[in-house]
Amino acid sequence: MILSSEREVAKAAFLKTHGFGDVRRESLGGDASTRSYERLHRAKNADEDGSSFIFMDQPPSVETAPCPPGATPEERAALGYNALARLAAGRVDAFVACAGWLNAQGLSAPKVLAANPAIGLAVLEDLGDDLYARLIETGIDEAPLYDAAIDGLLALHAAPTPDVLSFGGSTWPLLTYDDLALKTAHDIFIEWQPKFRDLTFDEAALAEWEAIWAPIRNTGEAGATVFCHRDYHAENLIWLPERQGAARVGLLDFQDAVLAHPAWDLSMLLHDARRTVSPERETASLERYLAARPELDRTAFLADYHALGALNIIRILGIFARLVTRDGKPRYADFIPRLWVYLEVCFADPALADLKAWFDQYVPAEARR
């Protein structure tokens, strides 16, 4: 790993090489990952218009390796969590390739202005600060924002999906959110929730857990037909009202994209861990999506949405438990009660009766907070 002083030298050299040596740098902090961001400001004068840019810093070799195409389950297990889950391991080449593909579809990912994936640095178009989450907190009418977000998903789901994404000299495979990745997703819960809430799952509980999830995973992999952003929620969407159609939604944090079931990103949007999406908003958004896709079997799709939504919520519960207990980030505990509310709504689907019964038996009410 590059030491901080060495990293700063590398960052300054990168900026100078690509014509950004004279900018003012403003730290924007990081997120739950190993990335950090800065806003670069150019002074406004006769030669410059005072533009701003985003500087992304993802140090190489910080995370475990991503999943090579064709890797066996055993090889993925040996490589670690990112390979099991088919995450991009923060690789800048994944971001560059995904951004280029998204923009080519007429969507609004940040344009990549300069990048060196080998050292994990990139300068990006600045899409501004109008995150969905921030705007909604001000009391703005959220309906147009969610309608546009659904339109963005419809555009994504209508786009042809290549095996490999390519842009600006960077390539990245669009892998399937397969059985092993989905199993890794729901098993985060049984690994980390016991440490967070002092639970114990015996062999019988774990055997029942696997039997319940196997057919749901099969649904997820069999239905993996669309480009999946994988983190499509209000903290990663920027409102760009001056643009048209689906391009009004600025997209961030999409480098972990996979080929997945279309219900997955709907769950990310409507089961938002960081802000409450009302049942009315959820219903209106689902209706907008289904109205635009009359070829779908409505009943079957909603069943898939509830099942894969439950898997997604349980995955996030496990991730937040890990962030709190392993990584010392207690603020993520504040989001957990909201996730349990979403999960109870999914449990209302009779097809998930066995999953609901498992939680009723092994996760008492006092642990669901």
Feature annotation, model-predicted:
Residues 20-43:
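ATP-binding glycine-rich phosphate-binding loop
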Residues 34-41, 54-55, 156, 213-264, ...:
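Active-site acidic catalytic loop and adjacent metal/ATP-binding pocket
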Residues 42-184, 195, 221-222:
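ATP-binding pocket architecture of kinase catalytic cores
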Residues 172-216:
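Active-site catalytic-loop/activation-segment of kinase and kinase-like phosphoryl-transfer enzymes
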Residues 187-197, 259-296, 310-327, 339-347:
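Active-site activation/catalytic loop segments of kinase-like enzymes and analogous catalytic loops
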Residues 318-369:
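ATP/Mg2+ or Mg2+-diphosphate-binding catalytic cores
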